[in-house]
Amino acid sequence: MQVSDFHFDLPDELIARYPMTERTASRLLQLDGQTGALRHGQFVDVLDQLNPGDLLVFNNTRVIPARMFGQKASGGKLEVLVERMLDEHSVLAHVRSSKSPKPGTRLILDGGADGEKVEAEMRARHDALFEIHFLDPRPVLEILEAIGHMPLPPYIDRPDEDADKERYQTVYNQKPGAVAAPTAGLHFDEPLLEKIRAKGVETAFVTLHVGAGTFQPVRVDKIEDHHMHSEYAEVPQEVVDAIAATRARGGRVIAVGTTSVRSLESAAKVTLAQGKPLAPFFSDTDIFIFPGYQFQVVDAMVTNFHLPESTLIMLVSAFAGYDNVMSAYQAAVAEQYRFFSYGDAMFVTRRRAQA
């Protein structure tokens, strides 16, 4: 298939630049992957789509304040976006500046209102990423909390604000490391989670530290030629056990977000392909899911509306059928749903292979 097959026209005013006042106030477009049928509603209607015995799988990564501003010691301005923490004092990062820093370059990173400055050094370059070592005794996370900004996606097109520290974060986040939010999870608040549990729906948590590569455009014509960026994922034993128990009782595995889908399917790719049962997974993954992929674990998913020609709309198309998904997106535009990270959501069931 061509990347252009996944294009759709999106009016700029449908890009959500701020979240709704309440997390659950978003709208929900329900798509039956088998029939293509659509139903319009509110996000709280997700409760009606869940059955006792189902398993909801969330991504519990925590977004770190990964964006920093400063200058080289020689004076040139720069912007640093952390992609991955290497250890307590070093990171891999994207660096934007008029000239790329060379190994040994000193960086002076600016703090907030108190004028704090942190020194760092560029140690090495790894393709598009720079290895940066902080010349500060504090751990990386502490430094980022002190001087970093929330790394809002480029299409939000505004500076980060204090409210983003809470709203660009799920309520159940636990493990710091993401530089983009697992956005399907932003719609859940504690009262809704309590209602979900009270209905007899089980919950489990994987971790996938979403990287900045999630916003990179696909730069090839044929989707089969695209190489995915790599991200670290964890599917612990308790998730494997929860999935087995769900299957045994006839329930469905419902992934909250494409990152949860990719985590679960990455684990399955390693073991089920060998004819072995699902096993824990703690590794980098570059799994690329596009139409033709055979899903092994996930039966339904909650997901936001994604960018045209992105790997994420390709994943949803693989899940629910290309024609169904593109028609749903056309309907969403016509009905003026809000798009992308702070936008509305879909509840999508999987399209089964025809007998």
Curated annotation (Swiss-Prot):
Molecular function GO labels: S-adenosylmethionine:tRNA ribosyltransferase-isomerase activity
Catalytic activity: 7-aminomethyl-7-carbaguanosine(34) in tRNA + S-adenosyl-L-methionine = epoxyqueuosine(34) in tRNA + adenine + L-methionine + 2 H(+)
GO CC annotation terms, alphabetical: cytoplasm
InterPro entries found in the cross-reference section: QueA (IPR003699), QueA_dom1 (IPR042118), QueA_dom2 (IPR042119), QueA_sf (IPR036100)
Pfam family, one: Queuosine_synth
Disulfide feature: none
Record's keyword annotation contains S-adenosyl-L-methionine: yes
First-level EC class: transferase
Cell location: Cytoplasm
Keywords attached to this entry: Cytoplasm, Queuosine biosynthesis, S-adenosyl-L-methionine, Transferase
EC number: 2.4.99.17
GO BP annotations, alphabetical order: queuosine biosynthetic process; tRNA wobble guanine modification
Family membership: Belongs to the QueA family.
Free-text function comment from the UniProt entry: Transfers and isomerizes the ribose moiety from AdoMet to the 7-aminomethyl group of 7-deazaguanine (preQ1-tRNA) to give epoxyqueuosine (oQ-tRNA).
UniProt protein name: S-adenosylmethionine:tRNA ribosyltransferase-isomerase
Gene of this entry: queA
